[in-house]
Regions:
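Blade/loop signatures of beta-propeller domains
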Residues: 2-9
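Acidic, Ser/Thr/Pro-rich low-complexity intrinsically disordered segments
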Residues: 9-114, 118-173, 201-202
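Aromatic sugar-binding surface patches on proteins
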Residues: 81-86, 181-187
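Short, surface-exposed loop/turn segments at beta-strand-coil junctions that are enriched for proline
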Residues: 90-95, 107, 179-181, 190-197
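One face of beta-strands
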Residues: 115, 187-189
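Low-complexity "stalk/linker" and mucin-like segments enriched in Ser/Thr/Pro/Ala/Gly
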Residues: 168-184
């Protein structure tokens, strides 16, 4: 038997700390939306050390499902190999009451099945990571290369220019711009430094 806990969300953005108390429960949160709004819904559970494997769905004013997510792979959470948390983006099609439904994938529940829900406007952003995180440039060797990976958040599609920040004299690279569909850039670094040069940041 499924039971429901329903709550009206008065204003957005909102963060809700909740719990699936009993097996088979669904928590439902209702909010008023406007046509054309770009919204993000995110459920954190495993990242908070909860045993919950969340499942998320969003229904519109007519009750039809508009978005669904079980497992969302978060590239920024490298230590987690089981991406069990949920995330969905949605452009609202019309004015009216929308509902966010949350449960456990295998319908588990209990005191330890806590979660954190975020409902907010999309906040496009990005984070960069380099591989390797450090590099040895041998004197007079001509340089080396690094790969720069971008993690885009909340629908970010802006072009991202990538280059070295304030390199010392004798070190240079040609800037590269990541388009909205690219996730990695390779920087070729030229080096013309003496062998006695100490370590420095790029």
């Amino acid at each position: 038997i499924r039971s429901f806990y329903e709550k009206l969300v008065d204003t957005l953005p909102v963060i809700v700390n909740g719990r699936i108390d009993k097996k088979g429960d669904w928590d439902v949160f209702e909010f008023q939306g406007k046509a054309g709004q770009d919204l993000v819904t995110e459920v954190q559970a495993r990242r908070l050390e909860s045993p919950m494997d969340p499942v998320l769905k969003i229904t519109g004013p007519d009750g039809k499902m508009l978005a669904f997510n079980d497992d969302y792979e978060d590239a920024g959470n490298g230590v987690n190999t089981h991406h069990a948390d949920s995330y969905a983006t949605l452009k609202l099609p019309t004015d009216g009451a929308y509902r966010v439904h949350i449960s456990d994938t295998v319908r588990g529940g209990g005191e330890e099945y806590g979660y954190r829900l975020r409902i907010s406007a999309a906040r496009p952003d990005f984070a960069l990571r380099t591989v390797p995180s450090s590099i040895t440039l041998r004197a007079k060797s001509g340089g080396g290369s690094i790969s720069v990976y971008v993690q885009r958040k909340d629908g970010c599609t802006a072009p991202i220019p990538v280059t070295l920040k304030n390199p010392p004299a004798g070190v240079s690279c040609k800037p590269v711009t990541l388009t909205g569909t690219q996730s990695v850039a390779r920087l070729a670094i030229k080096c013309d430094l003496p062998s006695s040069t100490p370590a420095f940041d790029l």
